[in-house]
Amino acid sequence: KNIYGPYEWKTVLTQGETKINGPHQGAWVDTTTGEDWFLHFQDVGAHGRLLHLQPMKWVDDWPVIGIDKDEDGCGEPVLFYKKPDVGKKYSVCTPQESDEFNSQNLSPQWQWNANINEKWMFCNGQNGYIRLYSYPVTDSYRNLWDVPNLLLQKISAPNFTATTKLTFKPTKKYTGERTGLVVMGLDYAGLFVENTKDGLVLSQSVCDEADRGSLEKTNASVSLEGNTVYLKSTFSTMDRKNAGNEGGYDLVVMCKFSYSMDGMTYRSLGI
């Protein structure tokens, strides 16, 4: 074999009869004990891209990934398999989801919508909160796709509820400043607290095809008597597939929103 060629190609992993669409864009990894494995992603629509780990072996100088049931040199991905042998045992754990912000640094599940600017936030771990600072939008602003200082985390499960308590202290000399809780994607929906000329207003808004520059639509709004509010989003995966979209796991997702002034009694708002 020569690094300069000639080159050959061969399909060594395909969806086959599984529900794992794709699969593609991955990397070969090996363990300290000599095992071979393959990492790849699966596009699951609103849930983002799931990471899969597949067993891998070498047959006649070609990698065979997943399970090769018919022994034709092309495997299918698996959902369940024995764990890699990494030389020692580790306890079962899951990525962090909740956060009381009791550290001076952001927990690793958080990510920004753009390259981080340290002026966007201040972590007050001693008192258990994070302070987020707002910045003016650009003249070309269309929707939140144009906003870099969104603090986000990946979808953690097919069904879950996210709740946050926030206190909004807008700059009094400006109107239009806002904050809130958003489920962000190609489309997005959320609860937004805005400083208006009539005081603080909580709105439930959506933006379809946000990635294409669409404008937000407000479904419902209420005036707030105080500046501390609890916001809740219930994320549910429905048992029906998005029409025309690829993948057995690309299912319709629904989000419902509610709010509370005391953290106990919640009222639905919007969709």
Functional labels for PLM-detected ranges:
Residues K1-I271:
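Carbohydrate-active catalytic/glycan-binding domains of CAZyme proteins
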